[in-house]
Amino acid sequence: MRSSSIRSLLWKETRQLGRNRTAMLTAAMLPFIILFLAPIQLLVALHFGGSPGIEELRNSPLPGFADVTDPSQLIVQFFYPMLLVMGGLLLPSLTTTYAIVAERERRSLELLISLPVSVAEILAAKLLAVLAVTALIGLPYVAIVLTLLLILGIAGAGTIPALLAPFLAAVACSICISLLLTLLARDFRTANNLSGAFVVPALLLTVGTLGAVGGPARTYVVAVILLALGALALVAALRWVSVERYLE
């Protein structure tokens, strides 16, 4: 693949995504709820003395909660990682549906194929554009929430990488899943069904790991699992599903 071709295509894809109101609205609203509004609501609940749900989960017999001694720990070590993973998984996959699958459905690929570029370069540029949109929209929400944790004294500086690790791993995993989704899906309906089939198991594994693994290392374990899932999706996309399938 040629980096010059990818850069040119990336600029074109980023501009095209910016003009797609449906894609941008979906990419903006869902992360706002998952990565910003829900964490802020948890902070408000904690400030006013917690909630019954938090207290019940803190007293759960699950081994992952054995070392949790107060609601703030529960929020930082369980709820926030879960929300960050959810946002990191959903944002790229939803953007991919509008950015890539919709183009196949509209039969507008012929214009791109007529250019002196390969299918691999087209896909690389599209996925990099999805990654750019994810960073542009998702990272500010995450940065605000993590800054509030530090300002309010709920978490220390060492907690920041522990929370960023599962989020970044979820984004990487979702990008790899998006590549596989791009090669398999033919229309919006198929893309949405496949997206749920890929993302839901990753979310269930995340929740199970957070509940089963104790201590601050739990988020890093989640990150490793998500990266492993992403690697499997990438291998499946490159080895068992031909990139040329994108043209079919």
Model regions and ranges:
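Junction motif at the cytosolic side of a transmembrane helix
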Residues: I100, L184, A228-E248
